[in-house]
Amino acid sequence: MTIRVGINGFGRIGRNYFRALLEQGADIEIVAVNDLGDTATTAHLLKYDTILGRLKAEVTHTADTITVDGHTIKVLSERNPADIPWGQLGVDIVIESTGIFTKKADAEKHIAGGAKKVLISAPAKDEDITIVMGVNQDKYDAAN
C-alpha cells in the first residue's frame, strides 16, 4: 500500500524530507506541498540546493504544481493548516515542517483538513510521543 504524503512548509527541512522520500523510492508518494512561496521559486530551490547540490531529476512547474521526473505534485499556499484540503488530495501523513505549528492543538488542524496523521519535524509541545531514530523508534505505535 502506498503512503500518500503532504508537506507543510517547504523550507530547508521540507525540501530535505522531499528529497529523502524521493530517493527512498519505497511505497511513498508525495502528493502535495503547502508553502507561501510561488511555484517557480519552490521548484528552483528544490532543484538547486546549496548544501545537497543539484537534484538529479527533471523539475518543472506550473502556477499550482511541481513536476519531478513526470510525477506531478499539487502546490498550495494556505496559511491556516485547517484550510489545506489534505483529505481531498488523499493525504495519509502530513509532515509539518514550518516550525510554526509545534503544539499538538495546532498540528491537529491538519487532521481537520483531512490528514490521517501528522509528523512534526521540530520539538513539539503536548505531542503524543517524541521519536528519535536510533534511540526509541521502537516506541512508535502505528495505531496511535
Q: What are these model-derived regions, one by one?
A:
Residues 1-144:
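N-terminal Rossmann-like NAD(P) cofactor-binding subdomain of oxidoreductases
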